[in-house]
């Protein structure tokens, strides 16, 4: 995510949306292509999601989003569909880190999650730490510079690759005795 402004339509769901409905377990070890993983996103919760989602769209949910098993595809299926961010009242810790480590912005903002309605236009201003929707503007706690670096790089793997490449191309520092 290099864009500091995310704009899209809200896809709103409830509390305790677990990883089994984000990405069905039956595909966990059988699919590896991005397009195949994307096609099965939320199919048991919202069969219209994968065909209808557009780049920049935002998932909005209640409490404990991403609970359940540690399934990386629960985050990557959203990334592969172009989801710009997930806004929730709260996240399962394991999903939260999986999302960030895969370049998916996960925002804890209970007021926005409650105010946003399904299908409405949503704007996430990352630089201002604000969510805007028809009901108004809602502030969220900023992510640390390190975490934002990971998200902006497109995930932890890309972040580490970039850091290693930068270190490899940096001029050698003289050794001091």
Task: For each feature predicted by the language model, list its residue ranges.
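Feature captures the catalytic cores and cofactor-binding loops of soluble hydro-lyases/lyases
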Residues: 12, 23-25, 29-128, 145
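Conserved phosphate/anionic-ligand binding catalytic regions in large, soluble enzymes, centered on
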Residues: 17, 66-72, 151-160
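N-terminal, positively charged, Ser/Thr/Ala/Gly-biased leader segments
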Residues: 1-26, 31, 158-177
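Exposed boundary/loop context
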Residues: 1, 7, 18, 55, ...
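Acidic, glycine-rich flexible loop/linker segments
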Residues: 102-177
């Amino acid at each position: 995510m290099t864009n500091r402004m995310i704009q899209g339509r809200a896809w709103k769901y409830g509390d305790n949306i677990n990883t089994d409905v984000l990405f069905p377990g039956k595909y966990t070890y059988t699919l590896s292509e991005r397009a195949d993983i994307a096609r099965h996103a939320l199919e048991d919760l919202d069969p219209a999601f994968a065909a209808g989602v557009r780049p920049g769209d935002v998932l909005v949910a209640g409490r404990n989003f991403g609970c359940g098993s540690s399934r990386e595809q629960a985050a990557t299926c959203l990334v592969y569909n172009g989801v710009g961010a997930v806004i929730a009242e709260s996240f399962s810790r394991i999903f939260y880190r999986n999302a960030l480590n895969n370049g998916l912005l996960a925002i804890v903002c209970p007021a926005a999650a409650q105010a946003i309605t399904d299908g409405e236009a949503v704007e996430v201003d990352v630089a201002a730490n604000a969510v805007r929707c028809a009901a108004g503007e809602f502030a969220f706690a900023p992510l640390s510079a390190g975490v934002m670096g990971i998200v902006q790089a497109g995930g932890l793997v890309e972040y580490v690759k970039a850091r290693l490449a930068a270190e490899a191309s940096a001029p050698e520092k003289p050794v001091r005795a």
